[in-house]
Design a protein with these regions (language model features):
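Charge-dense, helix-prone N-terminal extensions
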Residues: 1, 26, 31, 72-73, ...
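A detector for short, charged/polar N-terminal pre-domain segments
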Residues: 1-19
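Polyanion-binding surface elements
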Residues: 15-33
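Short, well-ordered coil↔helix boundary/capping segments
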Residues: 19, 40, 66-70
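A short, structured beta-strand/loop element
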Residues: 31-61
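Long, intrinsically disordered, low-complexity Ser/Thr/Pro-rich regulatory/activation regions
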Residues: 54-87
Length: 87
């Protein structure tokens, strides 16, 4: 099983992960071809350059703790499902 598959299974597993890190999120999204762009301060935007019709996924990178909050995990899951990255 590849790293992307393990991260995807973990993200979409039940119950949702409470310790999914920012670096794991970036790694998973890069596996789908989604790039990260830094904004002001801790703001980050994720976009797919091969699919301009897909809107940006806007996120706030937490600090100093880089663990995603529950609502962030749900937002990522909804984004990936809505735009066909995950079935």
């Amino acid at each position: 099983m590849s790293k992307k598959q393990k991260l995807r299974d973990r993200l979409f597993g039940s119950p949702p992960p409470r310790d999914f890190s920012w670096s794991q999120l970036v790694s998973l999204l890069h596996g789908y071809g989604i790039n990260e762009k830094s904004g002001d301060g801790s703001r980050r935007r994720f976009y797919d350059p091969s699919k301009p019709e897909v809107p940006f996924l806007h996120m706030h990178k937490r600090h100093p703790d880089d663990t995603l909050l529950a609502y962030q995990v749900e937002n990522v899951k909804a984004f990936l499902k809505e735009w066909g990255y995950h079935k």
